Amino acid sequence: MKSLFEQFEIDLYCIIITRFFDVSITTITVYLGLLMVIVIGMYKVSLYKATLIGNNNWQHIGEMIYEFVVDLILEQVGKPGILFFPFIMSLFLFVLTLNVMGLIPLSFTVTGQLLVTFTLAITIMIGITIWGFRIHGIKFLNIFVPSGIEPWLLPLLVFIEIMSYVLRPISLAVRLFANMLAGHLLIHIIGVAAIYLMQFYFIGILPWICVIAFMFLELGIAFLQAYVFVLLTLIYIANIINLH
């Protein structure tokens, strides 16, 4: 690659602009389409094989992910959180699959785009805020009022709580974006060094070993970042349900 950041450049394939929306097809659009095909295809294969031959590896993987997400919801939110299972399951698979897809050589890392992660984070926060007003009404605003505080401190703490709430989507988005960006840049740098050092025979093997090791590390980070993203989302949901 000519540039270190070339792998994060967004290509425009087709311009489609309607009266109200710009629905042009870009690299992000293509990879989101692939994401849907992969996730739906994986579960279709799992169900198809389960019908023909009973238990299979695909089914076991699906069940492991299902149980992992359910346990996470019960741990962070409790039984009321099961209502959010379809959303949390979809969110986890969305982030995890995009993270893993970005590890494929010469591919595009969708979660390495701040625009994508911020759009996802702000949509989540708007959605759970609307839900908070729906279940609590005007009492939802009590989430910004700490209990047991001296009256003269209340305005300052309410301001801090509001700012903390407003900044949540930014921290959620930047955390995922920064980790994926840094990891892929590191692999790129080590890969370029490995190609350069190949001319030194056995010395050139060492960087390639590092590349492979970092690829496995990035695979773990891909899962970890999906876990953290979903975990923080559940914590925010729990805060809204319990108003604290």
Swiss-Prot record:
Subcellular location as annotated: Mitochondrion inner membrane
TM annotation in the entry: 20-40, 81-101, 113-133, 140-160, 176-196, 202-222, 223-243
GO molecular function annotation: proton-transporting ATP synthase activity, rotational mechanism
Keyword Mitochondrion: yes
Coiled-coil annotated residue ranges, if any: none
Chief location bin: mitochondrion
Entry function: Mitochondrial membrane ATP synthase (F(1)F(0) ATP synthase or Complex V) produces ATP from ADP in the presence of a proton gradient across the membrane which is generated by electron transport complexes of the respiratory chain. F-type ATPases consist of two structural domains, F(1) - containing the extramembraneous catalytic core and F(0) - containing the membrane proton channel, linked together by a central stalk and a peripheral stalk. During catalysis, ATP synthesis in the catalytic domain of F(1) is coupled via a rotary mechanism of the central stalk subunits to proton translocation.
UniProt-listed HAMAP family: ATP_synth_a_bact
SUBUNIT field: F-type ATPases have 2 components, CF(1) - the catalytic core - and CF(0) - the membrane proton channel. CF(1) has five subunits: alpha(3), beta(3), gamma(1), delta(1), epsilon(1). CF(0) has three main subunits: a, b and c.
Full protein name: ATP synthase subunit a
Gene source species: Dictyostelium citrinum
